[in-house]
Amino acid sequence: MIALGRSLPGGNAQNIRWIDSFAEDFPINGGPFDLTVAAASIHWMDHSRLFPHLLANAAPGHVMAVISGDYPFEPPWQSDWHSFLVKWVPAVTGQPFDHDKRSEGMRSYQKYLNLYGSEHFVSEHPFQQSVEDFVSCQHSRDTFAPSKLGDRIASFDAELAELLRFYADDNQLSFVVGTRIAWGEIKLI
């Protein structure tokens, strides 16, 4: 992500510091910062370490923004996807799949923020992706990482691909993408 960000217009601007580090342990050199942007992976982080560290290095008026969601928004395969998760999440994690609890966990960082606002966006135009690429992208998620699936990865891939092919046109899925942004200031805790 950092390489991509640097390659985009303005990515080498003097007022941008690119830091490659665990968020909880990033180096404190370079002075306070005005904006912190996090992605969906924030739910993997140790919030009790992360937010005090960010706050200690934030400039007055600092804003924290969290962008989450690259998910198909209400795709035609939603019901089948849910059934797939009900089967595979417990097989990998040992815990039952609970969509409401998962959603709550994905927002657990919010207790560390005084939220100014949040918005949900849905792409204007459908996104197209091959079935194979969609399946492959699932391995970027913690639950379905190759290290967690182990020797079950081929079965996972085959089952998900079979499910999705029913909804594909010439092996291409078409769906709109949902994204959410929330922003605020870090609380003194």
Q: Model-found features: residue ranges?
A:
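A short beta-strand submotif of the Rossmann-like class I SAM-dependent methyltransferase core
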Residues: 35-39, 47
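Structured loop/turn residues at beta-strand edges in well-structured enzyme cores
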Residues: 14, 30-31, 175-177
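Conserved Class I S-adenosyl-L-methionine
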Residues: 98, 102-189
